[in-house]
């Protein structure tokens, strides 16, 4: 289902530590869009079902999140970041970016966050098995899912340029 809006919605997803929040913030700021950090919103707006002590994070309530952001997403102009992607309504997004990071670099990033070893191992396994990429490919039209490397500063700059160009092309095509 295509929804006509004046600005696109973009999902930036990937394993924790791939740079989603940083990239989403820059893209939103540079393109006069809203940045929606789902993990922060879950905590701040209590869109969860409690705390998972094993993974040391809140248990996201997908229905609460969708209810909270439905009206905002319909309007467009949002850059959403979250490590999961398969549960969002497909109609919300015009572009789905899946960030991928070299395993050694990802491990270092997760250790710097003081993740416990179980959580680090789980996230590294997800990256190795390309779980998020497969979820995106299985949940959204193939033509809107783009896999981008996110290991180096050069990758980050290239990703910013790619997404900004995509946004410009979207405006030309849709307005």
Swiss-Prot record:
Its main location: cytoplasm. One of its GO terms (molecular function) is ATP binding. It is found in: Cytoplasm; Nucleus. One of its GO terms (biological process) is maturation of SSU-rRNA. It catalyses: AMP + ATP = 2 ADP; ATP + H2O = ADP + phosphate + H(+). The keyword Endoplasmic reticulum does not apply. This is Adenylate kinase isoenzyme 6 homolog. It comes from Dictyostelium discoideum.
